[in-house]
From Swiss-Prot:
Taxonomic source organism: Mesostigma viride (Green alga)
GO molecular function: DNA binding; DNA-directed RNA polymerase activity; zinc ion binding
Binding site for Zn(2+): C233, C307, C314, C317
Subcellular location: Plastid, Chloroplast
Function recorded in the entry: DNA-dependent RNA polymerase catalyzes the transcription of DNA into RNA using the four ribonucleoside triphosphates as substrates.
Self-association state and partner proteins as the record states: In plastids the minimal PEP RNA polymerase catalytic core is composed of four subunits: alpha, beta, beta', and beta''. When a (nuclear-encoded) sigma factor is associated with the core the holoenzyme is formed, which can initiate transcription.
Stated name of the protein: DNA-directed RNA polymerase subunit beta''
Amino acid sequence: MGRMKKIFFNQKSDLNSMKLFFCNRIMNKGEIRRIIAWFLFNHGTSRTAHMVDRLKILGFYHATKAGISLSIDDLSIPPTKKWLLEDAEQEIAKTQKNYSIGKITAVERFQKVIDTWHSTSETLKNEVVQYFEQTNPLNPVYMMAFSGARGNLSQVSQLVGMRGLMSDPQGQIIDLPIRSNFREGLTVTEYVISCYGARKGLVDTALRTADSGYLTRRLVDVAQDMIIRETDCGTKSGILLGPVKDEQKVVFSLQERLIGRVLAENIYSPKQKQYIAKKNQDISASLSDKICEIKRTNILVRSPLTCKSIRSVCQLCYGWSLAHGNLVDLGEAVGIIAAQSIGEPGTQLTMRTFHTGGVFTGNIAKQIRSSIDGKIIYSLTNTIPMRTRHGEIALITQSNINICIQGKNKEFNIEVPINTILLVNNGSMVRAKQLIAEVSAPVNAQSVEIASKYVASDFSGEIHFENLLLQEKKSAYGHKMNRAGQYGGLLWILSGQVYKFSLDVPLMFDTADYIHNGSCMAEHNIISQYGGILQTSENNLTIDNSNSYLYVLNSSMTIINAYLSHIKNARSEAYILTDDLNQKFFMQVESNNVIKNNQIIAKFVTKTYLTNTGGILKYSSEIEVDEYDIVTQSYPVRKGGIIMWIPEETHLINKDASLLMVRDCEYVEAGTQIIKDLICHSSGLAQVSQTNDILREVVIKPGKIYRPIDFSQVLDKHQTLIQAGEEICDGIIAEELVYLENVNLSSGSALLIRPVVQFLIPNSTELKKLEAQYQLKQNISIQPSIHICYKDGQRIHAWQSMEIAKIFLRLEIDSHLHKLNVTLNLIENKLLQIKMFEYLMIDLNQIIDFQSYQNVTRLVRKFNNYIIPGTILAKTEIIAKDHGEVRQSNKNFEEQKSFLIMNEHDQMTLFVKNAYEFFQLGDLVHKGKEIVPGILAPQSGQVIQLQANRVTLRLARPYLVSSEAVLYVDDGDFVKSGDTLVMLIFEQSKTGDIVQGLPRIEELLEARRTKGLKPLPNNLHDLLQSFFDEATEKYGIQKAAKKSFEKLQLFLVNEVQSVYKAQGVHISDKHIEVIVRQMTSKVMIEEGGDTTLLPGELIELHRIENMNRNVSVHAKYKPIVLGITKASLNTESFISAASFQETTRVLTKAAIEGKTDWLRGLKENVIIGRLIPAGTGFNVHDKMYSRDLSLSNSYNLAYSSNSQHKRIEQKNAEYNFEDIIFD
């Protein structure tokens, strides 16, 4: 924690020669990290662990002595904060003024406000640090944050500086910053804004942590079988390494990238005239520096991407194990290490992004400030004027220019690069520390996105365009829209109170009329269309209510030959209508319900159409029915007749056939047991239906069995009806209507003569009608109607009684009155009453806008009076709350008519001598502009009246509209406060953080084709195909797959790295290379040639290359990239694939194909409980693996010999010996 420590280290690991050196540095977190790394490299892990342990004890000892803790007095706020905030507020007030007079657009104002607060926040952050250093370097807050023990600069600045700008839940920056810090305490508004970001942080952290964890799981699954299995695969190829750059800035130097790699070429030094490094030599930090002195870029190194080992990586292609800075050991599970290295920062980043709770951190342009007071001089030759993003006019340099600031005693010279924005005019006076220029970074097309901002009206009034030309364009959806022209212009709102009426309200005034407060502006009549008796609701009509009703009784009927009774029990209640013949009707609607034309209101209770069992229904030829009615679940009868019912008893069983107690086609008596606990209710022929030993149903068909002398004579009588008196066969005459059916019995074929029951279906007109007494008109009636429940020929599967026809009572309304409402009054022990009303709602909200008017509604007719159609019942007068001159819009709107009232509140009078010299009618005046010598305009407005010594302005507000903006209003329109005027289109830099980072990583590693149902441009599949097409032309089809894979692999590695680098996270390339190797190892067969492969099959590239060497007609194939999920499911091991996803599918497929799992990976061995083939278990597996490989000669690959293994083991033994420590 202290400022300075004397630390002594022995340079060699030899314990006897204790050569010490003095390390005179401030020991903060970074320095301790460097020391530990150096110690680890020079002294091994055991000694380092011991040293770190002693460092810990030393740290705790001094921490205990110091007793550092945080008290509220330690949070000292820099005094400069007050004037920094005052400066920012002055700058923003100036910006707001410019916006209100139409000098800058809403977007420019917003960006200026954001940038002002951001730079204030940054400046204050630096002031905080300086203040601590100058006043109290031993301040606990300062020591904790800057030693790296706890907290960071951002958190300290929020404690004692200002919290700064925050984002809202949509990620947009709120232009109201949090000026306070936590020491001073937040205001209520600031606290609420602050909570936005904190809540968003918590939710996002939870979601991203899950995403990151799942990413790690998929990566582990895809790479778990990547193990270092041999020393050298013998490859001659490698990849070219150079520094990683973001625009001009080096993000990842070549020195760093080379450390831990193995060279694939010899490096020759022309100065020393000798090789300083040889092929297959691993690169240490010192060697990396030497190589970079000779070659700046394109150094050929070995890589897991080009390793020839099958389903593994060799030691030399992998390079160092980053854990201990030596060549990786045999049996190291590098796949799992790679997966964790890529997946883990996802979680970490997720946490890190949101620690500050959504504080906005944008990238600020490099600023150039004057170091002295003086006069600024520069050449204007290589500059052109431009509008900055803050709407200010500035100069931008087209080449490097020199700026000179001439002070009283000295000069200050600075050379600024191309694309520098000069914010101060040539020859102006500048103060020390004043911002004079900003160096703008070259804009990358990918870092810019098109954004939009809506501008709403600040007050109501009339739209007026100044120098604003419109172009009519079509949107992406084909809608027409107005776009501002190339140069934009000004959109003015001329003040006035805007009123809107519905179209059918007649206005009582005209344009240019003067309206007085309390005068009638419009009158709305409430008219009865149908006539009748005017009534009110039960609660008396309150006319001043905005939603009141008037009722006009159009007609009323009362049933006189029937009365209502109310039945109620524990389960339900119902109304029964009983007529003078004691026929009962079950009411289907409740009291006071509104009913429609043709609606069923009651059902006739009768047993006339009940059957004993199920059966077959047949219509006679006279019957005609309408289409099926869903409400009544029946067919309305248009014309009556007879329906025939052939009874049969059906039992649906669905049980095992062995339970059946009767035989198929056996005649059974009523009461016979069919299966246990199930008896038949009718006598007849039993027919059994079963499938696959499951008993489906048993049908009992009543009737008599007759065996004809000659069965062929009755074949054509199967399923026919025989009328009474007709011959059945062999001279037998039918006594009544019967149904014939041929049946096959065990003793031979026979005829089943089945009984038929007939039901009479009358016409609806023949049914008895209820008698009614009418009041007013006969516009409504109750009509009986009969419905058949089943269609002709339908078989009804049932054993209990069924209803085959129903009689209903339905309401009929005259066709011209269908819009009217009909209600039923059900009164117990009284008559049924039906009334038809015309409801007239006084909905004043539809007619007018209440904020602007008063209204008075008067009844012009008395209640209970009869009125004829078209009579006015009430009048609503709309009374003006304001006074003033009326202006009407020339435009016809589809829904509303609008007008505007302008009074003295919308005007301002200026006393000016000789007004005619300076003004003309219609002139537009900007606030703050000199209108006559010595007089500035106090408000913006339009000249509407001129007299010799006075000018009347109509107050107005200008809005600057940029080019290509989309306008939602037109010249002359009336708008209210808050209406959207225009959508400004602008470019903004994309803000990068892990919220975009993790999905991008997933998009790359899963090789996504689409995003949000839209195809992804430049997705990996399209890129690979284009690389393959190029390579085929250049190298031929045999080499094309390999070459296109190499290109895609490098692209993928760089893309993944760029996402992590943007977050400041360091991941070694080799980890990403291991994963990418797994994604790009397979090809898809297009033509099998002489191989046994089928088109569409996926196979590893090295296998198909070996196969093609041994056949005359080569197989054709194309490279494919598999996402990590697909690669996991397409792995050689089905046990591993099944444990990942789609277990049943993977195992079923493996079983059908008779697959063998060779248990090469870690996962499959863990699952079946064997020793894993990594670490200590490697040698056991390696012997078996080598034996497996020696059996398959087709692969043609040389594996490492035992002598190489011994050499490596000896080398490792040496390292381990070095690591022993004697305390």
